[in-house]
Amino acid sequence: MRIVNAADPFSINDLGCGYGALLDYLDARGFKTDYTGIDVSPEMVRAAALRFEGRANADFICAARIDREADYSVASGIFNVRLKSLDTEWCAHIEATLDMLNAASRRGFSFNCLTSYSDASKMRDDLYYADPCALFDLCKRRYSKSVALLHDYGLYEFTILVRKAS
């Protein structure tokens, strides 16, 4: 979790939380968090709530929007499957979601996307491959001067970290 300061307790919104894998990751590394998982799938939210039943400082909500401000917000994997959406429609969806992540985050947010630098022979029509440079530019212009683009790990994806001024 390169977006957070691990030394201090923090609150976090996990948009597209699925069954709560990020909370497992945070717990395994000893992070002290107030966690809210948000997902559009009622089945995933139920599964996550059952997995973490009785756990303090962990809530799971079935929704498409974040309605709570936190120190950080993350979105992992939610921009990959576009089904039959046109590029223009999907780009507008991504931008609206980034606006929401920004509004819901006091200290910063992060997200990942499949990269347009993927091997053409492995690309699928139902997936969206974003231009990392375009999204980096958008984040620098719209959200913060402190933006990092991570495109140096073994997957055909990239991560953008947006840190807000303290």
Swiss-Prot record:
It holds the Pfam family Methyltransf_25. Its EC number is 2.1.1.-. GO terms for biological process: glycolipid biosynthetic process; methylation; symbiont-mediated suppression of host innate immune response. Gene3D superfamilies: Vaccinia Virus protein VP39. InterPro entries: Methyltransf_25, SAM-dependent_MTases_sf. The keyword Lipoprotein does not apply. One of its GO terms (molecular function) is methyltransferase activity. One of its GO terms (cellular component) is membrane. Disruption phenotype: Grows normally in liquid culture, traffics into host (human and mouse) acidified compartments early after phagocytosis, suggesting it no longer arrests phagosome maturation as well as wild-type, impaired growth in mouse macrophages. Decreased synthesis of 2,3-di-O-acyltrehaloses (DAT) and increased synthesis of sulfoglycolipids (SGL). Decreased colonization of mouse lung but not spleen 42 days after infection. The keyword Metal-binding does not apply. Keywords: Lipid biosynthesis, Lipid metabolism, Methyltransferase, Transferase. Probably plays a role in host phagosome maturation arrest, as well as a role in the synthesis of acyltrehalose-containing glycolipids. Belongs to the methyltransferase superfamily. This is Putative methyltransferase Rv1506c.
